[in-house]
Amino acid sequence: MKNQLIDRLTRYTTIDTQSDPKSTTTPSTEKQWDLLHLLEKELQQLGLPTDLDENGYLFATLESNIDADVPTVGFLAHVDTSPDFNASNVKPQIIENYDGKPYKLGNTKRVLDPKVFPELNSLVGHTLMVTDGTSLLGADDKAGIVEIMEAICYLQEHPEIKHGTIRIGFTPDEEIGRGPHKFDVDRFNADFAYTMDGSQYGELQYESFNAAEAVITCHGVNVHPGSAKNAMVNAIRLGEQFDSLLPDSEVPERTEGYEGFYHLMNFEGTVEKATLQYIIRDHDKKQFELRKKRILEIRDDINAHFENYPVKVDISDQYFNMAEKILPLPHIIDIPKRVFAKLDIPANTEPIRGGTDGSQLSFMGLPTPNIFTGCGNFHGPYEYASIDVMEKAVQVIIGIVEDTAENN
């Protein structure tokens, strides 16, 4: 199977599908259609009925091969790649039997070094796909697409493996947070699903952050500095004051595990107007609400010293902890746990310090945990994929549909 995985991942990663947060269309970029149309053709060649809508959501069905009434399970992956780094002219490189030593990426000065990326130490002996140092790889999430496609191929070649109806979904714009925005849960028509969008071997994730964005706008009064006493209000300094009133220890670089944070993403402005953009994250719903409340309290504390209330706050929720919707349905987690145990894969159920499409889909009526893909260092030139771990991910998909049919 390794050769098929390498061939398919190479073909998919060399197609530029970078999304664009500034775009208002869905998909956000025309080039995502290139991969969507290819996948549609390949699924049809496998004999699967497909449904590609005007927003770039590609669904397909592998029909049940048993008479029993068993749940319909779905598998999802996203076609877009991150806008954080160059995604064009991707030139995948193969490392056979990785020796655990630093590896120079193409003709660049970039080096994939286990001292910097210690997770590489667990991949000694693996076949790796890496970049040439000039682009990201796009294994996030084309590895997930490959794993789903190869699992479907395997199931068709092995009709002795009994399974219920399987739904497949390839979606746009996950990297810019819009993946589920136009996802039609009713049209997808699965009882539950799994995103193949994790990272390290053994990840089985069903807890995510609660997430919000806060935009703080500070309005100043610009007066000639020579006569500014008791008249000037410097919006930049108001922004600095606002940020200083947030807990210094509750930032991404000083938190881990279940610890939440405030993250100042952008701060720009002039004396007259300054804007601060934060993301707010916490796994605990009560703490999440308290964090948003603290933002409003700081606004009020600063505004109390002025007559014209110069600080404005706009908070918008982005997604919520999917555990709230998944934990009441324990079979959705028990199924992959049994499969992991059967395959001798140690399950890592640590919470996601982020979100997936499943975070939103779970609240839209489709409970959707996340499973490892075997890739790492996403969104940059050090991205890699372990073909060996990808092979395990394919086995997990096959095991999930088999277990669902057996245990109903």
UniProtKB/Swiss-Prot annotation:
Protein purpose: Cleaves the N-terminal amino acid of tripeptides.
Organismal lineage: Bacteria, Bacillati, Bacillota, Bacilli, Bacillales
Protein name: Peptidase T
Pfam families the UniProt entry points to: M20_dimer, Peptidase_M20
GO molecular function annotations of the record: metallopeptidase activity; tripeptide aminopeptidase activity; zinc ion binding
Uppermost EC category: hydrolase
Subcellular location(s) per record: Cytoplasm
GO biological process, one term: proteolysis
Binding site for Zn(2+) 2: 140, 175, 379
Cofactor(s), names only, from the UniProt record: Zn(2+)
Cellular component, GO, one term: cytosol
HAMAP family linked to this entry: Aminopeptidase_M20 (MF_00550)
Cofactor note: Binds 2 Zn(2+) ions per subunit.
Active site: 80, 174
Keywords in alphabetical order: Aminopeptidase, Cytoplasm, Hydrolase, Metal-binding, Metalloprotease, Protease, Zinc
NCBIfam families: peptidase-T, PRK05469.1, PRK13381.1
